[in-house]
Every structure is written in structure tokens, then in C-alpha cells.
């Protein structure tokens, strides 16, 4: 490949609307061009990286025994209505009508379509297991597309779907895909973690996310440095910080706390540790009988985990109570609420840590007043108890093998055990060896192909530009001749090196544009090609060229006769 036959369109400055590093560098490197909100053209440089990612994904999926197919981007609404997702999914599911007023969805995932394939094609246990996958365009109508391709609306995704005869088969398929994902991300050359996760709207029973570690990641990853425990913040278990509850040492006292509606302000005003305060969070669930009010209690320095709250029996479809509902139920505005003496009955659920607290401070259900010296069993009934909070660094690891730490990550892959969530709703069944009809056990497995690009950049860049891991770089090597258009010796040697590297199977590009050295070097450092060979007249007179790795501070002189072998050695390192 020669640069004159390629398309290079770099920018000195990033567009004003580019917010994060990957967005800025992808725009500057000419990898993407914005077409609309969350919609991008992938230019030749960017597409080469996508193809490298896709090739690795495809190789490992095939190695794992998955079978590639392709499903339509536009899908009939009837399939989505069978599973209930047509109504359950919000505006992020793009819906449209054809000329006959028939409803369709633009696929964000393809569970319904692949289940339809399975139910029409699979009849017997002898046809199982099977795992179908595709690498296909997806669309989610994000409310606020941002961060370039990291939170775009149109994207490329690898989605796979396994079908098994029983739970043991599903577990085996799940582990097979988990192992394949580990190989994929190792081949990408990225630092990553696989973490236990919540299944969310897709449904099912088991789930892991794969995160690329990056300081700019939007997700919090909880892990134990001394064990294999890892989970995302939604799923990380928070153990009680107190093993047992101490006996009461204080009397219950109602104390004036004028204009102190936040736990930190109450603690400062009363001169007590924030850890002695309890925060009240009011939720509501709706039914034909009306709204049921819930009071969730967490320690003043902790944060509510809404996913965990939704796991409390009865709270699956909770909403936050309105201020009118709060005042009507507690007789007090928010900021002064607590479990003692609400005007109307409420369901109280305490976080594990709160359940073991004694002599704590909470709202008195009276504006400008709080209780101190509050104790369970003496001042109010024992509560229902649940894990309600986000973990914090230093918490005990649930596996008992150390304490937890927290880092940031970018989710780029997700594996789910769906079970019979879709097969039962869509009647995807098979006949077992006894001739009995059984629902297929399903798993689904996604990788954000285009998102990998942004995540890789967020983890690998410097002040000069992108530093691609070798496996997914747009080119492995760039040959930069200084004076290619005016020095025959330089041109001849650059052409020879380029030709020999091509013959050796190296993905190399020759910059024959005739640009000044500064422009040429800046372009390729910005684009992030891992290896560079510079051919110049001065070096050739000494029988040398210069090799420089993208992370190297200095160039290394290499004999002209040895340069191809040297580069191949660096590629193999």
C-alpha cells in the first residue's frame, strides 16, 4: 500500500464538539467523520482498524464452534411483541412503519429474530447445541449521543446466540464463549477485566461484562487485588461493615437541626461522624390499589444502588416518590425523614450496614428536627434487610480474600445466560430423546466492535496521538522516505524495503506523498502506526536507516541490509 493510493485526512485541531480523548484523536486522525448526531462515516483508516477487530473476533468465534449468519437490520414488530420488548423498551428502540403501515424495529439486538430461526429450524435434541453469530450494524436511539463512537446511535456489534437442550449445556456454552472472549481481548492487546454483572433488560440468570481498563471509563469496576473477585458496581455485593450490632448506649432524643437537610450538614452541626447518620430514600410502587410507599435506609456516607433496590421483593418496578406523596406519608418534606412515626404505614428496608447500627441519627419526620440515639428493637421494629448500597474502596471482598478496590472501565463485551426467557415466550422448543417437548436454553454474547476502537485509544495514547496495539493497528509499519520525490537513492531504498516487507506478509504502507519530514512523522504518530522506518539521504550514505517504535523515545540506526529482519523481529516481539 502506498499513501498516494490511500486516503489520509488528518487535522491539527479536534472539532469543538469532541469531548473525550478517543473522539478527539479519531477525528484528528481522519478515522471518522460525523454525519449526524451519533452517526459517523468510517473513513479508510478507521475501517482498516474495524476490519482487524472483526477478523480477530471472527477467527475466535469460529474456533469456538459458532456459526456465522446475517440477520436483517429491519425486523417485524410482531416478533418483538411476542417477547414483550416492543412495549418494554423505551425510545431507544427505533420504530418505523412501511408504506403498508406495518410496524418494524431497527435492531439494537437480535434475540427475537434468532429465536424465530431456531424455532423454525430446530426440531430435535440431535440438532443441539448450536451457536449462531453475526457481525452486523445496530441502532439505538440514544437520548444524548456523545463521546463519538463510544455512545453513538449506529454501531457495529458482534452478537452470538447459543441454543442448548438443558442447563448443563447452557453452562458449557456460556463458558465456551467466556473463554473465547478472553482470547479475543488478549489478542487485541488490551488490559481488560471480566466482571460479574446484572442482566438488565435482556433478562436471564448469569452475566459477565468485559471492560477495557481506562481512567476515563464511565463504569466503576470493583475488584479484589488479592483474589479473582471482580464485578461491576451494579452487581458488586456490599457486606455489612459491622459484624454485630452494639448494645444501645444513648437515649432517644429529638434534636433541633434548623435548615440541615443533608446528612453531612446534620453530622457537622451535631458534631458526630457522618458514619453515624442514616439517609432516608422514599420509593413508590404502583398497583390498581394505589401507590405503596417504601422507605429505604442507607448510611449517610453511602449511595443507593438502584439495581440492587429493584431486586428487593416488590420493588422491581419502583419509582421515586413525589414530594406530594412524601409529605402526605411522612408529614415532613424531604431532608428530615426517618423510620420513626410516619403519618401513614410504609414498608421499611434497611441496608445491611444500617441494620447493624446502634445509636444512629435519622430524620424525625418533622421539619428542622432529627433523632439521635436511635436503636433497632427499642425505638422501632427490626427492619427488613437487603444489600442496597454501592460498595466503596476498602470494603471486605465477598469471597473473604481481602478488601475491594475500584477502577474505571469501558464496557466492550457482555455475555448472558438467558435461560428460557425468549424460548418460552416465542415457543422455541425441541423434542428430547423421550419425545417430550422442551424449551431451548439460550445464551447471548455481544462485543461492541466499533466501541473497541474508542476503548483501545482511551487506554493507549500520548500527546502525539494514538498508540495502537499491534494486532488492531491500521498498518503495522510505515516507511517514511525523506525526499522520496526528489532523491532517487532514497526512493529506490524505500521502494525496496516496502516491497520486501510486503513479500514477507507485513501490513506496511509507504508514504510517497513527498511531505516534509515533520508533517509526515506527525501524521503517522497521530494515526498511531506501531513501527516506523525512516529512509534519508544522510543515513543511506552511512548504509543505515532509522527504526522507531511508536512508544520509543529515540530512533535506532539499523543497517540497510538488516532493516527488514529487524522490523520483522520487532513485530514478533
From Swiss-Prot:
Matching PROSITE patterns: AA_TRNA_LIGASE_II
Residues in the signal sequence: none
Highest rank taxon of the organism: Bacteria
EC identifiers of the protein: 6.1.1.15
Keywords: Aminoacyl-tRNA synthetase, ATP-binding, Cytoplasm, Ligase, Nucleotide-binding, Protein biosynthesis
One GO CC annotation: cytosol
Subcellular location: Cytoplasm
UniProt catalytic activity: tRNA(Pro) + L-proline + ATP = L-prolyl-tRNA(Pro) + AMP + diphosphate
Biological process terms in GO annotation: prolyl-tRNA aminoacylation
An annotated Gene Ontology molecular function: ATP binding
Predominant subcellular localization, coarse grouping: cytoplasm
Domain notes: Consists of three domains: the N-terminal catalytic domain, the editing domain and the C-terminal anticodon-binding domain.
Family per record: Belongs to the class-II aminoacyl-tRNA synthetase family. ProS type 1 subfamily.
HAMAP family: Pro_tRNA_synth_type1 (MF_01569)
Subunit structure: Homodimer.
Function of the protein: Catalyzes the attachment of proline to tRNA(Pro) in a two-step reaction: proline is first activated by ATP to form Pro-AMP and then transferred to the acceptor end of tRNA(Pro). As ProRS can inadvertently accommodate and process non-cognate amino acids such as alanine and cysteine, to avoid such errors it has two additional distinct editing activities against alanine. One activity is designated as 'pretransfer' editing and involves the tRNA(Pro)-independent hydrolysis of activated Ala-AMP.
UniProt name for this protein: Proline--tRNA ligase
Organism the protein comes from: Cupriavidus metallidurans (strain ATCC 43123 / DSM 2839 / NBRC 102507 / CH34)
Chain's gene name: proS
